[in-house]
Amino acid sequence: MPLTPADVHNVAFSKPPIGKRGYNEDEVDAFLDLVENELTRLIEENADLRQRVAELDQELAAARSGAGASSQATSSIPLYEPEPEPAPAPPQPVYEAPAQPAAPQSEDTAVRAARVLSLAQDTADRLTSTAKAEADKLLSDARAQAEAMVSDARQTAETTVSEARQRADAMLADAQTRSEAQLRQAQEKADALQADAERKHSEIMGTINQQRTVLEGRLEQLRTFEREYRTRLKTYLESQLEELGQRGSAAPVDSSANSDASGFGQFNRGNN
């Protein structure tokens, strides 16, 4: 059964028999308060890291599934607001856990990646649509001019008709060439934007995966520290209780403070 802050808070030691040496109650209570505060902080830090790993998993899944979504769907993703760090525990003589790294703004990077992809897609569609509209207009104008010129040429002479048809064919060929060139340029721009957006998306997702790996390693370190901390605390308390029960009544009572300090120093050295 895991040790909880409530267990440390509610622990009670029986007083030694008359004539037996015992620890100072105030010092024992003060030490237990330090243990309770540190254990509470470790549990809260562990829970916070679990929550951040879960949030990174959700952000990674959302970024993968929303890579081709519209800008309206992308704007509905909530921005990540980091939770405040827990209040630091009071100074204590036991081993202190390593400092927690700052929470990365991982959700902002996922939102930016999705928006870049959406913007690239919108720009490509807009360029393609504009180029097609211009090409259709050029073809329509060219056909109208050609028909008018052919009608006028028929009324004048066969020579004028032949010349008009040649000019009409030339205009149609030029319009077709220009429309194909504009479509090709628009497609090249769209492909370049898409490739750049995919590259940025891959870089951002790689950063998110690295941050997730770091947080998972940090979580495992905290788990190991918690297990070692509980084991050392339990061993220390059991050894002190056993030593207290084995000591005889011949030693002076006022030497308890020195033995407390000695045992407490050994416990600190073992943790360090």
From Swiss-Prot:
Observed phenotype of the null mutant: Depletion causes a morphological change in which one end of the cell becomes round rather than rod-shaped. This phenotype is caused by the absence or dispersal of peptidoglycan synthesis.
Coiled coil stretches, renumbered: 30-67, 139-206
GO terms under biological process: cell division; regulation of cell shape
Organism superkingdom: Bacteria
Region (Disordered): 1-22, 62-109, 243-272
InterPro entries linked to this entry: DivIVA_domain (IPR019933), DivIVA_fam (IPR007793)
Major subcellular site: cytoplasm
Modified residues (Phosphothreonine): 74
Induction info: Positively regulated by the stringent response.
Pfam families registered for this protein in UniProt: DivIVA (PF05103)
Compartment(s) where it occurs, according to its Swiss-Prot or TrEMBL record: Cytoplasm
Subunit note: Forms homooligomers. Interacts with PbpB and CwsA.
Task of the protein: Important for maintaining cell shape and cell wall integrity by localizing peptidoglycan synthesis to the cell poles. Protects PbpB (PBP3, FtsI) from oxidative stress-induced cleavage.
Similarity comment text for this entry: Belongs to the DivIVA family.
Protein name (Swiss-Prot/TrEMBL): Cell wall synthesis protein Wag31
Organism whose genome encodes this protein: Mycolicibacterium smegmatis (strain ATCC 700084 / mc(2)155)
Gene name in the database record: wag31
